[in-house]
Design a protein with these regions (language model features):
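Oxidoreductase cofactor-interface core, primarily capturing Rossmann-like NAD(P)-dependent enzymes
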Residues: 1-46, 60-63, 67-72, 81-84, ...
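A hydrophobic C-terminal alpha-helical subdomain
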Residues: 234-305
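Residues lining the SAM
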Residues: 8, 78, 283
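Short, conserved active-site loop motifs that form the nucleotide-linked donor/cofactor pocket
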Residues: 51-53, 138
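Low-complexity, intrinsically disordered/propeptide-like segments
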Residues: 30, 50, 303-304
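Cofactor-binding loops of NAD(P)H-dependent oxidoreductases
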Residues: 57
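Residue-level signal for pocket-adjacent positions within structured domains
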Residues: 54, 159, 191, 273-276
Length: 305
């Protein structure tokens, strides 16, 4: 009997919902999935209906993680943007090594270095080192900002005000973006590839696009006037806190927004250039930002509660 793949954050969260996409893509291929979820709800039941084994667990409880990993062949590790990454990494690395896991695909942010611009990115660097020391066949996906992040931000003001309000500088600011589904395709490619070099890192950028182009795309696809309003970091943090973002996520995203608006992003710079990873490993061309907006029109125009 084929051992299942353990997929963490399988229900999906605020970001690109990559765990949910990975689970669905694996199940479509007939690969058994053990979906690691924080709680049982309608999202986990949807995965159960698709054929996934549901495991309700806690990233920070080593016994819970050991039970989740036992009997699995490989792991997709995507820790939410919240406190606890290093504890979760240590628990997963230990459990995976004990269980004889031979492959772990680790999702991190675009830059993963000791001097990366956000606290979460610097933690991601440490997390990578721990997984590699564990000798469990770890590889790392370094994904850029998700379309879904931008979509969530737009929904807060676009329906009522016809505006996208963010601290991203002028409309000439260029952003490296990617669809969560494309990141999931890369993850599935790495989880199922017969040839894999442990310790390898795969940058994933689907497109580079200016704020001006983003606003123009919203207006064209949604059929309404859309404008960009630059707000201060403090105003963004206040809005984010009111929407329930945790302090870790606010600190990470605030630093990320500063870094992006302060960088004169050159698409030829390898740190920000569109990568061929999605097509070569994920098996499909990157989703365009316009396609993302078309697919999410109803959500983008729905007023937030």
């Amino acid at each position: 009997m084929t051992r299942p793949v353990l997929v963490t954050s399988a229900s999906g969260g605020r970001q690109g919902k990559t765990g949910r996409h990975v689970s669905e893509l694996l199940l479509k291929r007939g690969i058994p999935v053990r979906a690691f979820v924080h709680k049982i709800d309608e999202r986990s039941e949807r995965l159960r209906a698709l054929g996934a084994e549901i495991f309700e667990g806690d990233f920070l409880d080593i016994r819970s993680v050991q039970r989740a990993v036992q009997g699995t062949s490989s792991i997709y590790f995507a820790y939410p943007v919240q406190d606890g990454l290093m504890d979760a990494t240590a628990a997963m690395a230990l459990a995976a090594r004990e269980a004889g896991v031979s492959r772990l695909v680790n999702l991190v942010m675009l830059q993963s270095t000791p001097d990366a611009p956000t606290p979460r990115m610097r933690q991601n660097y440490l997390s990578e080192q721990v997984f590699e020391w564990a000798n469990i066949g770890a590889v790392h996906i370094r994904a850029t900002v998700f379309y879904e992040n931008l979509g969530a931000a737009a929904r807060q003001s676009l329906p009522a005000q016809g505006a996208v309000r963010l601290p991203w500088g002028s409309e000439s600011t260029v952003l490296p973006l990617v669809a969560g589904e494309d990141v999931a395709r890369v993850a599935v490619g790495l989880l199922t590839s017969p040839q894999l070099v442990a310790g390898a890192a795969y940058p994933v950028i689907g497109t580079t696009i200016s704020l001006r182009e983003i606003i123009t795309t919203f207006a064209r696809v949604l059929g309404k006037n859309v404008r960009y309003e630059e707000i201060s970091d403090d105003e963004w943090r206040s809005h984010a806190a009111a929407r329930g973002y945790n302090e870790h996520a606010i600190a990470h995203l605030s630093a990320l927004w500063r870094a992006l608006r302060g960088a004169a992003i050159d698409p030829n710079d390898p740190r920000y250039a569109v990568t061929d990873t999605i097509e070569k490993i994920g098996g499909a061309k990157p989703k365009t930002f316009e396609a993302f907006v078309r697919e999410g029109q109803s959500e983008l125009l729905a007023k937030s509660a």
